[in-house]
Amino acid sequence: MDINVAQLFQTINLNVIMPEVILSVLGMALLLVNVFVPSKSKGYLAWLSLIGIVGAGFAAVTGWGTTVSSFSDSVVLDNFAIFFKIIFLLAAGLAVLISDQYMSREECNHGELYPIILFTTVGMMLMAAATDLMTIFLGLELMSISLYVLAGFNRDSIKSNEAGMKYFLLGAFSTGFLLYGMALIYGVTGTTRVAKIASLVTQVGGASNTMLLIGMFLMLTGFLFKIAAAPFHMWTPDVYEGAPTPMTAFMSAGPKAAGFAAMLRLLLVAFPAMIADWSDLLWILAVLTMTVGNFTALRQDNIKRMLAYSSIAHAGYCLVGFASGTATGTSGILFYMLSYTFMNIGAFAVIVLVGKKGEPNGTVMDYAGLGHKRPLLALAMTVFMFSLAGMPPTAGFIGKFYLFSGAVQAGYIWLAIIGVLNSAASVYYYLRVIVYMYFKPGEEEFDWFNVTAPVALALVVSAAGSLIPGIIPSMILQFAQQAVKLI
């Protein structure tokens, strides 16, 4: 590694990682508060976490328009990192809002939940800001280890325990690929700095250097697992179904965005000279991921498994924009990840409300009659389903438009057509939920419990985030385009 300890301390600028510092300190403080201030209700921890998340958000946005590095150029604060940090903080905030009601109902509202969410967010933010392979790995491991705990957080649920174990075993396996790839790249180039790797790629032979090529593909394998791209998606349905629903919501949005953030910075900064090699691989994986995700989702009755396969398909849409290598496609990924955070977590918030203790109401059929019994809740779910399907005038439509436009600009017209066809196929299973809500009578009377204020706030924010960017996309697109220019 290119790190000299004396130089490292001279280059430390805590303002660059102030959001991470805020959440880290708060997370450790909440762990202590949870131990020394016992309380049956953990709601106060949720609100303290939200305050910290908002504070971290303010600390992040104040750096917009600047590019400052720290820790001997291991991390950077730029528009790209800030954009993704906002996505992570939104995902964390929404997950916290929908967690207390669910965890209290399931009698697993342990106080450690909220600090672990904060630590996961710190790991994701490090991945977006990292400009060194080892910093990327540090952020990824902090995120992953925290996610393993969140997946198995309901200790009384066999499915939750199984989800945590599966995620841990397969995640550790994928991390091995990632780390071995980094080792090969370091062995070939002699550096772990992303920018320096770019300047050395041509010197060491580029794609003609077998070790460099293998190292790049091994790293990609690790990231593709994190974003749940086929054929590295097999863990997703079981983990999403077994994990506590608020944690599934968080896992489906934040880590996926973190994986794309690290991939974008790594491939576009370190390996632009090898774009022909990784672009060909990505469009193949994009087609496979979209198709596997959508056509498997068509057969699902369990709504969490349906959204799990849907999540795989959405990773495929983003890979379309990635494979294009264009500014339009890349900014489309940023826009889409932000929109996806709102619409997907919003859908899971509705699942939290419809479910009962033990989650027996996990099928699409259980939503029959919801439009008559809880019209506002059904309306919110309709917005989320339309946005996930990419129907105008939602944010999902605009996001897919820019992803596929990037492919067309790069000459991948056929790839854009495949993307549109896959998106059309997905309409079936999203509309199926809406049909059951409005046109199928409920077979039994459910004792719908009240919607608490935090969950209601999460639903309102998610619905607004799913609609407003679709109606007025220019502002967010402008921010996304500014973020992409700096990588």
Swiss-Prot record:
A GO term for molecular function: quinone binding
Keyword Cell inner membrane: yes
Enzyme class: translocase
Disulphides: none
Keywords of the record: Cell inner membrane, Cell membrane, Membrane, NAD, Quinone, Translocase, Transmembrane, Transmembrane helix, Transport, Ubiquinone
Alphabetical list of InterPro entries matching this protein: NADH-Q_OxRdtase_suN/2, ND/Mrp_TM
Top-level taxon: Bacteria
Main localisation: membrane
Transmembrane residue ranges: 16-36, 45-65, 79-99, 111-131, 133-153, 168-188, 212-232, 257-276, 281-298, 306-326, 333-353, 378-398, 413-435, 457-477
EC number(s) recorded for this UniProt protein: 7.1.1.-
GO CC term, one of those recorded: plasma membrane
Subcellular localization: Cell inner membrane
Single GO biological process annotation from the record: ATP synthesis coupled electron transport
Topology of this chain in the membrane: Multi-pass membrane protein
Reactions the enzyme catalyzes: a quinone + NADH + 5 H(+)(in) = a quinol + NAD(+) + 4 H(+)(out)
Parts forming coiled coils: none
Pfam family, one: Proton_antipo_M
Function: NDH-1 shuttles electrons from NADH, via FMN and iron-sulfur (Fe-S) centers, to quinones in the respiratory chain. The immediate electron acceptor for the enzyme in this species is believed to be ubiquinone. Couples the redox reaction to proton translocation (for every two electrons transferred, four hydrogen ions are translocated across the cytoplasmic membrane), and thus conserves the redox energy in a proton gradient.
Family annotation (HAMAP family): NDH1_NuoN_1
Subunit-level organization: NDH-1 is composed of 14 different subunits. Subunits NuoA, H, J, K, L, M, N constitute the membrane sector of the complex.
Family listed: Belongs to the complex I subunit 2 family.
The protein's name: NADH-quinone oxidoreductase subunit N
Organism per entry: Trichlorobacter lovleyi (strain ATCC BAA-1151 / DSM 17278 / SZ)
The encoding gene: nuoN
